[in-house]
Design a protein with these regions (language model features):
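Charged, terminal alpha-helix-loop-beta segments
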Residues: 1-453
Length: 453
């Protein structure tokens, strides 16, 4: 038999998973075991929640007595360093199973009685804003015990970034972490991606196209929340491939008041038929703004950034065009001049390549900034796959970054040039004895030369 047909032994097998209960038990055990075995990975998942730097101990299905009933959380994680100890209960859901508020409240009560620091939940639910929990509980129970949430996408992203980019010192530990990644990426693991815009997506989409959507309509809030969750998912997946943290861009008020962000999205959707957000990738020229226009059926990504501060208008435009060698010719460029009101001169890249002057509305005005945008067709289906809204947004972001943004560099002024002694007037007077030369290099020479030109 050919070796190609042999199945390589796996540390965490996916065969034999029957039902969601077995799926959750296996995912919990695999994750917690790898957290305790791989030092850097365990630290990456626990340190943000206040755990000290130390060895991670992990346990599954630890029983507790709460009043007259028995409570069994999916897991318990403990980190100890010297006399300081941090512990958290862990609740896990896989597949389409969602967290239950009543169950989490009982775990918060157990954690308070036992002196634990937190309850950590893991599921496929992606909250629209980082730090926000997808499940509502009695806030009084959070006074002494913190509650944190991680999506499986976040867990997988952290695992990939730790292994492929940040690194794992011990080769055996790196292999173990790789086995967890293989497991979580398998369809049977129950660690799913963002794959549903919700049951309200289709009626809200149709209401937008018909012009009948109102802010009070049922389901409009859910669509707004899921769009923000989609952007968070896009950040996690893109960050996993780039090896850096990609984050949604939110104002301070939007971060502290999720309701304000949702109302803003709903207002834009009702008034203009658009869902808009932005993501930030480190070291890029600008944040990427993503706009899904439900009326036009398009997804547009764009960046705004400063033009060079010197040179003629044509020189500044050519500076940008040279950086867009790999960009599609349908990319749209808009040039904004100083003290200009309203939109600037705009055209497609293929036109600007042939005639940069099309982006100059007034040669007497200095070009101050550019906008580069790419538009693609928006999918309409609520789920994943061909023709889906989710995939059309994800593809638009990935393509725009790969073909445009990663090639753009911000302008920086050239450093001043230091004149050498060879530039002195004396050096140019060949055959004249040094003692007879009466001229020498002066700081005023460049000024005179500039006037002569």
């Amino acid at each position: 038999m050919a070796e190609e047909s042999w199945h390589e032994a796996r540390l965490i097998p996916t065969s034999g998973i029957k039902g969601s209960e077995e799926q959750e038990r296996r995912a919990t055990s695999a994750l917690l075991a790898v957290m305790s075995a791989v030092t850097e990975f365990g630290r990456a998942l626990t340190k943000p929640y206040g755990a000290p730097v130390g060895p991670v101990e992990a346990f599954v299905e630890v029983p507790f007595v709460l009043g007259d009933k028995k409570v069994i959380p999916d897991g318990l994680v403990r980190v100890t360093r010297g006399k300081k100890s941090w512990a958290a209960l862990v609740e896990v859901k896989t597949g389409k199973n969602v967290l239950v508020g009543e169950q989490l409240e009982s775990y918060l009560d157990v954690a308070r009685e036992q002196g634990f620091d937190a309850v950590i939940t893991i599921s496929n639910e992606i909250p629209p804003i980082a730090g926000q929990h997808p499940t509502k509980v009695d806030r009084r129970k959070l006074r002494r015990v913190a509650m944190h949430h991680m999506s499986w996408t976040k867990v997988l992203s952290e695992a990939v970034m730790q292994k492929e980019f940040r690194g794992v010192a011990d080769p055996d530990q790196a292999w173990i972490l790789g086995e967890l990644i293989r497991y979580l990426e398998h369809p049977r693991s129950g660690a799913m991606e963002f794959e549903d815009m919700g049951e309200s997506w289709v009626p809200i989409r149709e209401a937008v196209k018909a012009g009948t959507l109102r802010a009070t309509d049922k389901g409009v809030d859910e669509v707004a929340i899921r769009f923000d969750a989609l952007l968070r998912f896009a950040c996690l997946t893109l960050g996993k491939h780039l090896g850096t943290e990609v984050t949604p861009v939110l104002s301070r008020r939007e971060r502290t008041e999720p309701q304000f962000r949702m109302q803003s999205l709903v207002s834009d959707l009702v008034r203009d038929g658009v869902l808009t957000g932005a993501i930030r990738i480190p070291a890029t020229v600008s944040d990427i703004v993503v706009c899904a226009d439900l009326r036009a059926g398009t997804v547009t990504c764009h960046v705004d950034f400063d033009a060079p501060r010197d040179g003629r208008p044509t020189t500044r435009i050519n500076w940008l065009i040279r950086q867009l060698k790999r960009a599609p010719e349908t990319v749209r460029i808009e040039a904004h001049a100083a003290h200009e009101r309203g939109p600037g001169a705009a055209d497609l890249l293929r036109v600007a390549r042939e005639n940069p002057a099309v982006l100059i509305a007034d040669p007497a005005r200095e070009i101050r900034s550019f906008q580069v945008a790419m538009t693609s067709t928006m999918g309409t289906k609520r789920g994943r796959g061909r023709g889906s809204f989710i995939d059309s947004v994800l593809d638009a972001i990935d393509t725009f970054y790969a073909e445009v943004v990663q090639d753009l560099k911000a302008w920086s002024a050239a450093p001043p040039r230091l004149r050498s002694e060879s530039e002195t007037v004396a050096a140019e007077q060949e055959g004249v004895p040094e003692e007879l030369v009466s001229t020498a290099l002066s700081s005023q020479d460049e000024e005179v030369a500039a006037r002569d030109r």
